[in-house]
């Protein structure tokens, strides 16, 4: 969940900066100078949409370290850190890519993998997770994060986000142009779009951005199932991954802990559409039914 939220927030911030810069440079005025040029608008939307998404990808590892306060283990300071590095080294070797950076951060049970490529990736685990699980369960979580890197999930998410960004920007500006023309009526101005265009384009971008996040989260949930299966394959057995999920979800107590509920690791109803992870019960069922 953490890597998805960080990526989406960074993507939103980058898109906002690029959009404001484009407006200050008069790009919108150019696009609407002789009526709305749909081809140019689509090209502009794709440039900003994919550009913002790939800039977010390039910044993902730095942003993750900064926002979580993660401490990269350069030299193991104790046996636990040595075990962490050795385990990630073995898992990444099995997965067929260079060993990623390994980091630890303070907080409730959590873990994430991020980075722009397999050779420039990061795996981080929280102190809360290390304290609440045995080593076999921690290894399963590490295998899950290594599987995310192996499957290229950050790049896949970047491409999906780029497509989503493109359509959000395109539709928002096209509809804003219609709204602006309606508000201005027969008024003819050579100075470009009016205030109605600026206000409505921002409103439409926010609205479509929220709706588009449902698409991104849908693909994220699918990738979680693949990462669970990948973890089982890397470890050669499914039981440890199932046990780790049970600890994370607190299934023994019959309820999710507050930390995981707030992270959207499981949910129902409309909120499930905005969750980056499937319900833990569904993930366990998928692992148990796998052949």
Swiss-Prot record:
Cofactor(s) required, per the database record: Zn(2+)
InterPro entries per the record? HtpX_protease, Pept_M48_protease_HtpX, Peptidase_M48
Keywords, sorted A to Z: Cell inner membrane, Cell membrane, Hydrolase, Membrane, Metal-binding, Metalloprotease, Protease, Transmembrane, Transmembrane helix, Zinc
- GO CC terms in record: plasma membrane
Classify the main location.
membrane
Q: Identify its membrane topology class.
A: Multi-pass membrane protein
Sorted alphabetically, the Gene Ontology BP terms of this entry are:
proteolysis
Q: Which residues cross the membrane?
A: 4-24, 38-58, 152-172, 199-219
Q: How is the cofactor bound?
A: Binds 1 zinc ion per subunit.
Q: Which family does it belong to?
A: Belongs to the peptidase M48B family.
Specify the protein name. Answer: Protease HtpX homolog
Originating organism: Prosthecochloris aestuarii (strain DSM 271 / SK 413)
